[in-house]
């Protein structure tokens, strides 16, 4: 692994806790000026590469994130792609996994890292996790192998010394520094005294010379139905058969199981008959959908429900937005859902 003197990283601050510090005058948190990042994190100045910054205006609370942000991010990375060796996106933690998943599908053929990070405590607080997260993310974004290629040319989340594939990651804790976890895929890298890269898991481009393709068309007409004991036919019908959606993600029990009651299967068939795509993902934080194990899962498969395998809900949603934005054809979308596009599922 090496860094070159010509390496340059673009730090993109969208909003979130990491960029806040206390204003002694008003005695409240406010965003600091990221053009002065070396004053807040002087350790970055010790690296042999340049770190530039770009700040969104206005800043976006992660609870207010919309797909329009993802399009803006993709357009910014596309515009600056030739100017930088890697990109670090500072983002609020609540929807970071959604944004990282979305960018992974929107950028095809990445040859440079796009690393999302943030913090649980503001960077201006003494015990902040923000500095370590930022330093690790920048170092990984700048890291190259002996051939001068990026060590991790993927969209990732770097948090609490662990680098995870973005579309495999979920936020699992609201008050712990280990806020994110990738249950179905081991880390791509871990930062200790040294940064250890799991090169056997990292996805590399078919061509290092080819420019990535940026897909910015998204169709967000997706609903999510979370199964639970006592759910009523009317609630299921409103979500499955509502005219506003083109697709429905069903969060099922265990290995992809759902009620085998006739009314439920009839509503599945009705929704599919309307031309909708239905995707089965598990409510479990680890494991995979397998609709061949139990009769309750096989009913869904026989009806025409697509398997999400071991996809996270965040990744499944972003993937549907991407596929539906690419084509109005339900069969195209369904086939794409059951295809591993960016390392988001294991089959």
Task: Place the predicted regions along the sequence by residue.
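Gly/Ser/Thr-rich loops at beta-strand to alpha-helix junctions
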Residues: 16-19, 91-97, 163, 254-257, ...
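Accessory alpha-helical/coil subdomains and C-terminal extensions
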Residues: 2-6, 12-16, 33-45, 165-255, ...
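Short glycine/serine/threonine-rich phosphate/pyrophosphate-binding segments
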Residues: 20-21, 95-100, 130-134, 257-260
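C-terminal non-catalytic interaction/assembly regions of soluble proteins
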Residues: 252-347
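Internal gly/pro-rich beta-alpha loop/helix module
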Residues: 116-193
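Short beta-strand segments
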Residues: 12-14, 89-91, 115-118, 153-160, ...
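ATP/NTP phosphate-donor binding region
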Residues: 1-79
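Short Gly/Thr/Asp-enriched flexible loops that form oxyanion-binding sites at enzyme active sites
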Residues: 89-112, 260-267, 296
């Amino acid at each position: 692994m090496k860094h070159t003197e010509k390496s340059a990283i673009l730090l993109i601050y969208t909003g979130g806790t990491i960029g806040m510090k206390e204003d002694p005058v008003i005695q409240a948190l406010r965003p600091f000026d990221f053009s002065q990042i070396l004053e807040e994190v002087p350790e970055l100045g010790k690296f042999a590469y340049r770190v530039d910054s770009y700040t969104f205006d206005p800043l976006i609370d992660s609870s207010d994130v919309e797909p329009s942000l993802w399009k803006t991010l993709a357009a910014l990375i596309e515009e600056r792609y030739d100017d930088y060796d890697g990109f670090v996106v500072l983002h609020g933690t609540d929807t970071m996994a959604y944004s990282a998943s979305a960018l992974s599908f929107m950028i095809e053929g990445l040859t440079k890292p796009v690393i999302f990070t943030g913090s649980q405590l503001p960077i201006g607080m003494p015990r902040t996790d923000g500095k370590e997260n930022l330093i690790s993310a920048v170092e990984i974004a700048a890291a190259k192998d002996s051939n001068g290629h990026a060590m991790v040319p993927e969209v990732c989340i770097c948090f609490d010394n662990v680098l995870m594939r973005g579309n495999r990651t979920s936020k699992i804790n609201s008050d712990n520094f280990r806020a994110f976890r990738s249950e179905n895929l081991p880390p791509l890298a871990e930062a200790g005294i040294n940064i250890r890269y799991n090169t056997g898991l990292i996805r590399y481009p078919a061509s290092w010379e080819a420019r990535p393709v940026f897909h910015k068309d998204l169709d967000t007409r997706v609903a999510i139905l979370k199964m639970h004991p006592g759910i009523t036919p009317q609630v299921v019908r409103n979500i499955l058969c509502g005219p506003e959606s083109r697709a429905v993600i069903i969060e099922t029990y265990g290995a992809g199981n759902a009620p085998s009651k006739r009314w439920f299967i009839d509503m599945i068939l009705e929704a599919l008959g309307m031309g909708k795509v239905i995707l089965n993902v598990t409510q479990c934080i680890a494991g995979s959908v397998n609709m061949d194990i139990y009769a309750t899962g096989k009913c869904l498969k026989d009806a025409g429900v697509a398997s999400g395998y071991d996809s996270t809900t965040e990744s499944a949603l972003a993937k549907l937005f991407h596929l539906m934005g690419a084509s109005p054809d339900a069969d195209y979308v369904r086939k794409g859902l059951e295809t591993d596009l960016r390392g988001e599922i294991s089959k």
